[in-house]
Amino acid sequence: VRHSGNSFSFALESAILKKYAVLGLHEAYLNPSVLEFFQKYQCTYSLYEDYLDGRSLLSDLELFMNSLETNQTLGIEIDMDAIANMPSSAQSPSGWRFDEVRTYLRKIASSHQNIPYLHLTEAAPINESDDRIVGKALAYLVIDFSTQYCLKRVR
């Protein structure tokens, strides 16, 4: 999830958005203004480095999901920069494994009733090889979300 100078900031400031969570923010990118923003709007956030030290993302996801009302609208944004070695605007060797992201997305999509929004941001291929990787990655995420969310609604 992104957190500065974007539509989420506007939505929080305008009281359109009730809750906001950023899970796995890299500590090196947590500047004082972002921290102040999170505190001002009572945002939930966690650091990626805490997960390296044993914190459970699955537990954090469950906590956040349990804090939502049953039919509360939920939007999901996955910043492709957060995936290790993903061709993206801020590509990094450190980050989530792609299959971890798929697992967590599938978990969220299958466990909540009202998710009209999936935004996959910052993928930025620069050559033909990157095009294939990014294309397949985005396709997997869309298929995972669609099948899990739709299957849950049919059951």
Where are these regions (language model features)?
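Conserved alpha-helical scaffold segments that buttress catalytic/binding sites
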Residues: 1-155
